[in-house]
Amino acid sequence: MTINNINSFIDHTQLKPEATPGQIEKLCQEAIDYKFKAVCVNPVHVNLAANLLKDSEVEIASVVGFPLGASATDVKEYEAKKAVEHGASEIDMVINIGLLKNEQDMEVIEDISSVVNTVPVGIVVKVIIETCLLSDEEKIKACELAKRAGAHYVKTSTGFSSSGATVEDVKIMKKTVGEKLGVKASGGIRDLETAQKMIEAGATRIGASKSVEIVKSQSN
């Protein structure tokens, strides 16, 4: 199965701590040139990305509580609010993994819903569940809680833990959330074949830093 227009699935990503303004400018220009769905950047780069992309259709995703998810809920709220003020149209927040593992379901829901309710209606909230740290049962629970909390997407990984997206995890997540939520696969997706497998498994968005190489290989 060949996925046409794979660029429209891609969040072109630059989250390295050493990322410079020049690299963000390059990221945004590539997003315009290749018509990627979004760029995904750290909060400090949202304002620059918003200025660079203001005349384009490219969405701007800011990470929140990244990469550990261990920030206090009100800090995540503030971070999300400021990101939107600076031009973000999407928020990729990290779930509180410790609370999830401790089966503190209501606290996990509150952590997510607080961010969902802090940002204006129309802002897309993706919840990163960090699949590599979870059992299959915990992956299912995380997706169920994200859905109950009003999130719009569940996302596999930060790309900063022990491993990234797998086809098996995407299938589990898609089966759990159904058509109500999107599924974003991210972490370790470096080639066209892997990206296509993730989409076939149910991913509706792909997070990648090798986006240009992926798209170029599709056109070859």
UniProtKB/Swiss-Prot annotation:
Taxonomy, superkingdom: Bacteria
GO BP, one annotated term: deoxyribonucleotide catabolic process
Pathway: Carbohydrate degradation; 2-deoxy-D-ribose 1-phosphate degradation; D-glyceraldehyde 3-phosphate and acetaldehyde from 2-deoxy-alpha-D-ribose 1-phosphate: step 2/2
Main localization (coarse): cytoplasm
Active site: D92, K155, K184
CDD domains noted in UniProt: DeoC (cd00959)
GO molecular function, one term: deoxyribose-phosphate aldolase activity
Any one GO CC term of the record: cytoplasm
Assigned EC number: 4.1.2.4
Subcellular location: Cytoplasm
Annotated keywords: Cytoplasm, Lyase, Schiff base
First-level EC class: lyase
Cysteine pairs bridged by disulfides in the record: none
Gene3D superfamilies given in the database record: Aldolase class I
Catalyzed chemical reaction(s): 2-deoxy-D-ribose 5-phosphate = D-glyceraldehyde 3-phosphate + acetaldehyde
Entry function: Catalyzes a reversible aldol reaction between acetaldehyde and D-glyceraldehyde 3-phosphate to generate 2-deoxy-D-ribose 5-phosphate.
Protein family: Belongs to the DeoC/FbaB aldolase family. DeoC type 1 subfamily.
HAMAP family to which the protein is assigned, alphabetical: DeoC_type1
Name the UniProt record assigns to this protein: Deoxyribose-phosphate aldolase
Organism: Natranaerobius thermophilus (strain ATCC BAA-1301 / DSM 18059 / JW/NM-WN-LF)
Source species taxonomy: Bacteria, Bacillati, Bacillota, Clostridia, Natranaerobiales
